[in-house]
From Swiss-Prot:
Top-level taxon: Bacteria
Protein name: 5-oxoprolinase subunit A
Family indicated by similarity: Belongs to the LamB/PxpA family.
InterPro entries found in the cross-reference section: Glyco_hydro/deAcase_b/a-brl, LamB/YcsF/PxpA-like
Recorded GO MF terms: 5-oxoprolinase (ATP-hydrolyzing) activity; ATP binding
Protein's gene: pxpA
Alphabetically ordered keywords of this record: ATP-binding, Hydrolase, Nucleotide-binding
Lineage: Bacteria, Bacillati, Chloroflexota, Chloroflexia, Chloroflexales
Length: 253
């Protein structure tokens, strides 16, 4: 029987600013990447999100970023490896404290935005993130783009790794994500998201924007929750996977 983890980024509101449709998307995923103060996610948002995940049986992970509230973590900041390690460790610890108070154990760490993208191609940054994860707990899984240097770094420091693919993002021929500046970077149509998800799970490949068939082995697939129609896409994917006999569940330790 085929199984797959479906994850989403969530808890990305901050104070009076509301981002994403967490209530709409969380019932359809098995893992959640919770913002923990770097780009979003104040303490009350973190607590509310952890509680919602606990009630739904969704595995909770940290979603650290560059310290960039103003830019929502989508800007590259000129930090040293030591600074990156410290910022990532601090954000993991913040969410872990709240999770512990709610009797929830963190399961994974997935960098956000620019930090995720830089770590995919820069081993120095990737190693800084991996060291932070290992310093906190070697039982935490490190989530990174399938085939990227972040996966390499996780193996190097000896933490579990989860190679990630995307249901709602398009790919370049080299296996990287198409830059969000391009109008076709996001896949909006729910049926197209489901088709890409099934292609990844069944065939271990994804079709790039230029038509190239890119080999891709993924343990977890992300659905973004901060775009219009996210809940419908998540529901379509979950229902389509069930119809195909594919079980959705968080990775087992």
């Amino acid at each position: 029987m085929l199984t797959i983890d479906i994850n989403c980024d969530c808890g990305e509101s901050y104070g009076a600013f509301q981002v994403g449709d967490d209530d709409g998307i969380l019932p359809f995923v098995s893992s959640a990447n919770v913002a923990c103060g770097g780009h979003a996610g104040d303490p009350m948002v973190m607590r509310r999100t952890v509680r919602r995940c606990r009630d739904l049986g969704v595995a909770v992970g940290a979603h650290p970023s560059y310290p960039d509230l103003y830019g929502f973590g989508r800007r590259v900041l000129p930090l040293t490896p030591d600074e990156i390690e410290a910022w990532v460790l601090t954000q993991i610890g913040s969410l872990a404290a709240i999770a512990r108070s709610e009797k929830v154990e963190l399961r994974h760490v997935k960098p956000h935005g620019a930090l995720y993208n830089v770590a995919a191609r820069d081993l120095t940054v990737a190693m800084a993130i991996a060291r932070a994860v290992a310093a906190f707990s070697r039982e935490l899984a490190l989530v990174g783009l399938a085939g990227s240097l972040l996966i390499t770094a996780g193996h190097e420091v000896g933490v579990p790794v989860l190679a990630e693919a995307f249901a709602d993002r398009t790919y370049e021929a080299d296996g990287t994500l198409r830059n969000r500046h391009h109008p076709d970077a996001l896949i909006i149509d729910p049926a197209a998201c489901l088709a890409q998800t099934l292609h990844i799970i069944r065939d271990g490949a994804v079709r790039a924007v230029d038509g190239t068939l890119v080999p891709l082995q993924a343990a977890t697939i992300c659905i973004h929750g901060d775009t219009p129609g996210a809940a419908l896409r998540a529901a379509t994917i979950r229902q389509g996977l069930a119809a195909a006999g594919i079980t959705v569940q968080a990775p087992q330790r």
